[in-house]
Amino acid sequence: MEGLHIFNGFSGSSEARARHAAHQLGIPLHVADVTETFDEEIVQYLTREYLVARTPNPCVVCNRKIKFKTLLYYADRLACHFVATGHYARVFHNRQTGRYALLRGLDQAKDQSYFLFLLGQEQLSRILFPLGELTKKEVRSVALTMGVEAVREKESQEICFIPDDDYKTFIERHMGSSPAIPGDIVDRSGRLLGSHNGIHSFTIGQRKGLHIAAPRPYYVLAIDREKNRVVVGHEEEQGFSGLIVSGVSWIDGESPREEVFETLVRIRYRHRGVSSVVCPLSAGDEICPATGRPADHEEAGDKLIIRFQEPQRAVAPGQAAVFYSDDRVIGGGWIEQGIPLD
C-alpha cells in the first residue's frame, strides 16, 4: 500500500498531516504537485463561471479532472491496480453484466456521491471507497484504534482552496483583466431597490449581502448578465417547476433506454432530492421553457428538461443536477436554466 498527497498550491499544513498519518500507518507517502493544472482547471473555471453569472461546483470538476486522474496516474506508475479515497460513497460490481454502479454512502448525512457523478466505468472499476459502508462515528473509532490522530481535528465544511470560505475576495484576486462592474438590484417588475459591485458576488437563492432596507427579506431570483443586474424577490417568488441541464454524463456510459423517465434529482449537495420526470429538449418540436419559443438545434443539443413533481427553490445555473434511482447514481449534468413557476 502506498500513500499519495495531492498538493494544489492551497493545501497549507495538509501535507504535514498526511506525512504524519502515513508514518502512523507505516506506509510510504508520495506527493503530487498539481498546482499549475489546478489553477487552469479549477481556479480559472470557478472565476470564469462566477463572472458569467453562474454558480460553479469546483468539487465535482476537481474529482474528475484532478483527484482521480492524478490518483490513477500514480497508481499506474507504482504498479497499483486500485486507488482508495475517503469519500462517503460505494461502488458495486455486477458480476453478471460486468458493470459498475456508484451508490450513496450508508451514512446519509455524509454521503458524497453527488460530487462523483462524472466518474465513468473505467475509473469506478479501480476505485475503492472504504468509508462508504461506515458512519462518521465508526470511521473515527477505527482511525483512533489504529492511532491516526488526524480524525480528532475539527472537520472543515469549506472549499479546500478558498480561505475562510470568502468567495468574493478569492474571485476578485483572480479576475485578472476582467474588472467587476457595478449595477442595479431590481425586483421582477424592474423597480430599483439597490446596487451591487459586481454580479460575481451573488448566487441564486442568496439572502445575505443584498443591503436592501425592507420589512421582509429579499432573495436573489435571477442574475441578468446582459443587463448586469441582480433580480430579487420575496420567499414566495422563489419557486421553480423544473430546469434544463446540459453536458449530461451517464455512469453506465449510455443513457437510459426510455427517452422519458422518472428519477430523483438533487440540485445541490445538501438537497434531499425531488421526484422528477426527465425528457430530452428536442429542436423544433419542443417549446424551450427558458425562452418561451421552439428550441433551435443549438439550444437543444444534448440537453434535458427536468420537471419537478413539487416546486423547488434556488435552482442555480452552473450547479450539478444529479439523477438517482434509490441509492444508485444514474448520471447527471449541469444546470443551464431554472424554469420559474407560471
UniProtKB/Swiss-Prot annotation:
Keywords: ATP-binding, Cytoplasm, Disulfide bond, Nucleotide-binding, RNA-binding, Transferase, tRNA processing, tRNA-binding. Disulfide bonds join 62-160. GO terms for molecular function: ATP binding; tRNA binding; tRNA-uridine 2-sulfurtransferase activity. It comes from the Bacteria. GO terms for biological process: tRNA wobble position uridine thiolation. It is found in: Cytoplasm. The keyword Protein transport does not apply. ATP binds at residue 86. The record marks 87, 319 as: Interaction with tRNA. The keyword Nucleotide-binding applies. It catalyses: S-sulfanyl-L-cysteinyl-[protein] + uridine(34) in tRNA + AH2 + ATP = 2-thiouridine(34) in tRNA + L-cysteinyl-[protein] + A + AMP + diphosphate + H(+). The active site is at 62 (nucleophile), 160 (cysteine persulfide intermediate). This is tRNA-specific 2-thiouridylase MnmA 2.
